[in-house]
Amino acid sequence: MRILAIALVAAACLAVPASAQQFGGAENLAPNIPTPQILVDRMLEVAGVEPSDVVYDLGSGDGRIVITAAQKFGARAVGIELIPALCATARRRVKDLGLEDRVEIVQGSFLHADLKPATVVTLYLLTSSNERLKPNLEKDLKPGVRVVSNDYPIRGWKESRLVMVRTGSAEHRIYLYKIGETR
């Protein structure tokens, strides 16, 4: 029985590409690298976030983008995160800050999420992950919705704006796209 269990685990590992294993599974499309707060603020500024917006952060990690969207910009926000421990951390932070009425943290894959309510979508994913997500964005998002990507472009889309931000010795690119103006 033990040999069968080991064989099943080995087979499951082989069924998932090595790049996906590195990030914890086939649905996890990027490593967990928290966005520095200066970039969080700048991404939301570049998107022109206002209190009437609904900000979706795909791969929301510890919740810093959705929390900032609610606290500093007055927006409603939804964070979608695959990793349960990060969801728990984000939910705890949201509760501690009294933002439960403005921020929702959803545990699951953003590849299967309904993005239709979003007026702003934030991303800090790899270019290949953005490519995999692009059909969902094109299907779900209405014209005028702003998509902001930190460091990694969405291939085949024309950005409305490209902003360079320096943090210490690193230089970051913030890509702003507007649905309906990406071609």
Residue spans of the language-model regions?
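Conserved alpha-helix/loop element of class I SAM-dependent methyltransferases that forms part
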Residues: 34-52
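A short SAM/SAH-binding and catalytic strip from SAM-dependent methyltransferases
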Residues: 116-132
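Glycine-rich SAM-binding Motif I of class I
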Residues: 63-67
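S-adenosyl-L-methionine
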Residues: 84-117
